[in-house]
Amino acid sequence: KENGLDKNTVVIYASDQGFYLGEHGWFDKRWMFEESYRTPLLIEWPGVIKPGSVNNDMVSNIDLPETFLEMAGVKVPSDMQGRSMVPILKGKTPSNWRKEHYYHYYEYPGSHMVKRHYGISTEQYKLIHYYYDIDEWELYDRKADPQEMKNVYTNPAYTSVRKNLHKRLTKLMKKYGDSEELAKSFLPN
């Protein structure tokens, strides 16, 4: 305050992903379950963000560089994978803002012993594929099952949801230059 920085300084509090303390039978992190998937992000931007406001749009750590560049008035390179959050921070979420997240964890076998997996998370659903020495799919309805304890992948009531998520997952993998073939290329010999 003494130097007036409280009037023109953006303050951001973010964290690494959450850490399991026995949820789902695990310790550590890296899994796609909400306990380690969701991370805090608090931003104060004097004169721009309304104090005390809350936004639930899907943002990602890959959006931070683009956001910082736009805040600084620097042109964002077109080959970056994230999107600037500035419109959201100003209370004007773009109509084409993401409705899902893509996640891929490659480091198995390894010291953490977290199985290789990738998936898609939407506001209501999460589809996860475990691979390498297994081939297992999981689907969670986060509104009906917020703790993600009941896998409904084979439940006939979720057939259309499952098919839709598979299509969206394939589209995201292409968007980010990922594929099952690429994932398999990381497997040890």
Which residues does each predicted region cover?
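Histidine-centered active-site microenvironments of extracellular/periplasmic hydrolases
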Residues: 1-53, 60, 111
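Structured segments of extracytoplasmic/periplasmic soluble domains
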Residues: 2-3, 71, 155, 168-176
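C-terminal cap/loop subdomain of S1 sulfatases and analogous C-terminal strand-loop tails that border
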Residues: 17-23, 62-65, 70-138, 142, ...
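Short acidic-hydrophobic sequence patches enriched in Asp/Glu that either
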Residues: 33-37, 57-60, 77, 81, ...
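Active-site rim elements
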Residues: 48-59, 71-76, 149-158
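Generic structural marker for isolated residues within well-ordered, non-membrane alpha-helices
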Residues: 65, 149, 169
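Intrinsically disordered, low-complexity polar regions and short flexible loop motifs
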Residues: 145
